Amino acid sequence: MVVGAFPIAKLLYLGIRQISKPLANRIKAGARRSEFFRTYVCLPPAQVYHWVEMRSKMRIMGFRGAVIKPLNEDAAAELGAELLGEAIIFLIGGGCMVAEYSRQSANSHRKEEEMEARLGSMEAEIARLGLLTEELETRARVTERQQLAGK
């Protein structure tokens, strides 16, 4: 009985994706505590996200040109940390997808090369058998002529 190959790569990707959420939570907590991350990594994207979100909502509701107040520092740091965590999870998931795609592509390419090699050897065998058949036909004709000449 043949057992199929164990999908260790898929299991590994699943494990990485499961670990990404707690990892993102730790990075978010560190970003909230660190003044550098808070100021330069969390706040700017959060303010831009808030501005785009509020601008979109205002336009949908029909308020054009309304002034949008920036978030306070604590709210912006919290939103920025959440955005950072989601970006990390997204990047890890995307990386896993790209890795799985490249692995599948390499497997497919390898199988295709094996099939081409097998096809090439079969074609060579067919050509060899064709020559052998011609040689045997020639021998059969020679033998037949010799038998007819000997009678």
From Swiss-Prot:
UniProt-listed InterPro entries: OPA3-like
A GO cellular-component term linked to this record: mitochondrion
Keywords annotated in UniProt: Coiled coil, Mitochondrion
Localization annotation: Mitochondrion
Entry-linked Pfam families: OPA3
Keyword flag Mitochondrion: yes
Predominant cellular place of this UniProt entry's protein: mitochondrion
Protein's GO biological process: regulation of lipid metabolic process
Superkingdom of source: Eukaryota
Coiled coil: 106-131
Family (UniProt): Belongs to the OPA3 family.
Its biological purpose: May play some role in mitochondrial processes.
Name recorded for this polypeptide: Optic atrophy 3 protein homolog
Organism: Xenopus laevis (African clawed frog)
